[in-house]
């Protein structure tokens, strides 16, 4: 999964994904974190097209009646507030990829 920064219900999504994960299953995701420029909002796409002749919109962003302007770079603390990771996962790890400002997570469910 690489989209939680666009999901206003990321907490509920993480809780539900963890709930549905079988014991021994792996939960793996990345998301934008501090330092990543806002991307993938309709207004930003329109602005980019006006400012840059070489602007390319990813196909998944082109949708009729798309009005999602929600965007939030997520931190490890934001994710940790979603659930008790020590209670849910046998082992897990957070890592930040500094070049692209991505937060990585993997965990094995108890």
Give names to the regions the model predicted:
Residues 8-22, 26-110:
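S-adenosyl-L-methionine-dependent methyltransferase catalytic module, highlighting the catalytic core
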């Amino acid at each position: 999964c690489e989209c939680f920064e666009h999901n206003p219900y990321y907490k509920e999504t993480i809780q539900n994904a963890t709930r549905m994960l079988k014991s021994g299953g792996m939960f793996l995701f990345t998301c934008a974190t501090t330092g990543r420029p806002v991307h993938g909002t309709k207004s930003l796409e329109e602005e980019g097209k006006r400012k840059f002749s070489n602007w390319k919109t990813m196909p998944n962003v082109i949708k009729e009646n798309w009005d999602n302007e929600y965007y939030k770079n997520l931190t490890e603390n934001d994710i940790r507030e979603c659930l008790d990771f020590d209670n849910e996962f046998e082992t897990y790890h957070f890592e930040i990829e500094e070049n692209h400002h991505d937060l990585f997570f993997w965990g094995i469910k108890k």
